[in-house]
Curated annotation (Swiss-Prot):
Family membership: Belongs to the DXR family.
EC main group: oxidoreductase
Reactions catalysed according to its record: 2-C-methyl-D-erythritol 4-phosphate + NADP(+) = 1-deoxy-D-xylulose 5-phosphate + NADPH + H(+)
Gene: dxr
PANTHER family cross-referenced by the UniProt entry: 1-DEOXY-D-XYLULOSE 5-PHOSPHATE REDUCTOISOMERASE, 1-DEOXY-D-XYLULOSE 5-PHOSPHATE REDUCTOISOMERASE, CHLOROPLASTIC
Keywords: Isoprene biosynthesis, Manganese, Metal-binding, NADP, Oxidoreductase
Cofactor: Mg(2+); Mn(2+)
Organism whose genome encodes this protein: Methylobacillus flagellatus (strain ATCC 51484 / DSM 6875 / VKM B-1610 / KT)
Pathway: Isoprenoid biosynthesis; isopentenyl diphosphate biosynthesis via DXP pathway; isopentenyl diphosphate from 1-deoxy-D-xylulose 5-phosphate: step 1/6
Protein name, per record: 1-deoxy-D-xylulose 5-phosphate reductoisomerase
Binding positions (NADPH): T13, G14, T15, I16, N125, E127, G211
Gene Ontology process terms (BP): isopentenyl diphosphate biosynthetic process, methylerythritol 4-phosphate pathway involved in terpenoid biosynthetic process
Residue numbers binding 1-deoxy-D-xylulose 5-phosphate: K126, S152, E153, S182, H205, S218, N223, K224, E227
An example Gene Ontology molecular-function term: NADPH binding
Enzyme Commission number(s) of this protein: 1.1.1.267
Length: 394
């Protein structure tokens, strides 16, 4: 019987965190919840702690940690707070597996800590690779960590690629990576209709249940753009070897085309518990509570090219990848500000790519040298984005 694995979940109250706990609960003799973290959702984390009894609970916000401490009186769970505490539970000697699912740039440092500590990292935080792909992959190698992508698309690619990490796609006989995208809720919308999109409409994804930020990113196709950058770092794939294919049914999660003409695809119902279970159990397969795929019910599979004129965020992401250096970090920071502004009704849906492009144009692109440099670039890009938003509001 496999050894009991201690699991730290960074971002436990989000969609990925909750799905991870669901999978873990199906295998009580195999996994134990070691640490749970959240930003500020006290009630939600308290409920999870009462249910799963972790050794540690971490709130990024110190005030929230004090409230959590009160709610967990009498429980053996130790409550910590702050970024240093997130890094501590990510790198703790007794933690075997780290689910890195904090949304946004806040997840970067804890993921780096887990990498240097040699953990099995289930990576669901896009920004770690988008902002600091070069540095993070170096940390994974130096720390001897095991990296398993949890994004459904990258997990699919991982499953149909050769088992050893390649220094170049050609070494595995690979011609290109085909990254599938649902196309989001506005795939068939006109320019005029996109101008009038509301946050409520954008949050209604046709296939996936996700958090608000990633749902908006899916609607703008920025989510796919960020995944292109991730795929570059995960699989040593240059931009011209990654093609985005719109596939509205979200049944094929991605494909790899080989030089002999073969195309290998990973298929399944759109449920994040599948890639999570794959990451937890790898190289074994675990039951995840996911229904079997009914091909007769699916009926048909459609494919089309993405329209970067209506959805320029995808083009901006490819451009940032080709520019390299700090460009992806600038793209990411500007996008986070833009999405937040849209959700709060401060800018329109089509203002999101306008804001991002304005910030990319305004800032100098530098070679990446350190995490501290990237954090400074992130802050500067956010400042530029906020300034643009305020000027547009005048």
């Amino acid at each position: 019987m496999p050894m009991l694995q201690n699991v730290t979940i960074l971002g436990a109250t989000g969609t990925i965190g909750l799905n991870t706990l669901d999978v873990i609960s199906r295998h009580p003799g195999r996994y134990r919840v070691f640490a749970l973290t959240a930003n500020s959702r006290v009630d939600e984390l308290a409920e999870l702690c009462l249910q799963h009894r972790p050794r540690y609970a971490v709130m990024l916000d110190s005030g929230a940690a004090e409230k959590l401490q009160q709610k967990l009186k009498g429980l053996e769970t130790q409550v910590l707070s702050g970024l240093a505490a997130l890094e501590e539970v990510a790198a703790h000697p007794e933690a075997h597996v780290v689910m890195a699912a904090i949304v946004g740039a806040a997840g970067l440092k804890p993921a780096m800590a887990a990498a240097y500590a040699g953990k099995r990292i289930l990576l669901a935080n896009k920004e770690t690779l988008v902002m600091a792909g070069k540095l993070f992959m170096q940390a994974v190698e130096e720390g001897g960590a095991t990296l398993l992508p949890i994004d459904s698309e990258h997990n699919a690619i991982f499953q149909v690629m050769p088992p050893a990490r390649l220094s170049a796609l050609a070494d595995g006989g690979i011609r290109r990576i085909l990254l599938t995208a649902s196309g989001g809720p506005f795939r068939k919308s006109s320019f005029a209709e996109l101008m009038a999109v509301t946050p409520a409409q954008a949050l209604n994804h046709p296939n996936w249940v996700m958090g608000p930020k990633i749902t908006i990113d899916s609607a703008t196709l920025m989510n796919k753009g960020l995944e292109v950058i991730e795929a570059h770092w995960l699989f040593n794939a240059p931009a011209d070897k990654i093609e985005v294919v719109v596939h509205p049914q979200s049944v094929i999660h991605s494909m790899v085309e080989y030089i002999d003409g073969s195309v290998l695809a990973q298929m399944g119902n759109p449920d994040m518990r599948t890639p999570i279970a794959y990451g937890l159990g790898y190289p074994e397969r675990l039951k995840a509570g996911v229904n079997a795929l009914d091909l007769f019910k699916v009926g048909r599979l459609d494919f089309e090219a993405p329209d970067t004129a209506r959805f320029p965020c995808l083009r901006l992401a490819f451009d940032a990848l080709r520019h390299g250096g700090t460009a992806p970090a600038i793209l990411n920071a500007a996008n986070e500000v833009a999405v937040d502004a849209f959700l709060n009704g401060n800018i329109g849906f089509q203002d999101i790519p306008r804001l991002i492009e304005a910030v990319l144009t305004a800032m100098d692109i530098e070679a990446v040298t350190s995490i501290s440099q990237l954090i400074e670039v992130d802050a500067l890009a956010r400042a530029h984005a906020l300034e643009w938003r305020q000027l547009e509001a005048c």
